[in-house]
Amino acid sequence: PGGVMSMVQVPGSDGQFLATHKFYSPNDSKEAKIVIVTPKAQGGWEVRTLVELPFVHRFDILQSGSDYYLIACALKSGHEFKDDWSMPGKIFAARLPKNLSEFNEENQLKLTVIKEGMLKNHGYCRIEENGQYSALVCAENGIFRCYPPKPGQENWKIEDVLSVPASDAVLVDFDGDGEKELAVLAPFHGSSISIYKKTAGSYTKVYEYEKPAEFAHAIYGGDLLGEPALVVGYRKAERNLLMFTFNKDTGKYESRILDEGRGPTNVYHFVKDGKDYLVSANRETDEIALYEITK
């Protein structure tokens, strides 16, 4: 399938996954949907519709107890002309059955709207803390944290995290005090990279990258080279891939350029044989790049 913005393996399956289909751009995604992709015994793939959802941009599967929930974020709800943002997006959800064989074009999964009014509903990040899963969702009207229903309950819990226009965000404990900081790309496809620290129950900005990062889009937050780090890539101007860490000796954040002139869209971290790697989808240079990160 083309127009893939998200792919998530179905829990407990042998290679079956869900994927967005026909999301090409904010102006060309009225026919977007989430599809079920299943490997065939003799090779190839079976592709079926799970649910048609215009402008679906990011989605995920979150576990709560023994149940699994689909959470899906539509960038907007419609438009009348190019770059029309007059119809804000929404967050949709549904309990996901363990057997997806019944779903197809004629019998689609029923979704429920759990939050409306999400202008430029772009950013998504899965959070796992103490075995519990939740999601950070970023839009022009702020950053929100969504918790799936607890076992035996039906309603989602949604918290207001930060009231700033945001494109993407991740949570990372940079300074090691046990409280995760909030790293934010702002505004929508914007040029600001900031880090907020939680004090007295609310987030306060403690760092902002001194240079504009035009069309910031790729983001990873987590361990890198054995320490908490933020990786950000941006698609215009210098088109750099950046790494941010916190220096405990100086009490200051530091930045490092990992690569230049590539224009990353997405970035993924993994460790193999004790070495740290980043895979970057460098859209502006038509390449998939593999980086081994060293000190």
Model-derived features: where do they sit?
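Beta-propeller-forming repeat regions
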Residues: 1-295
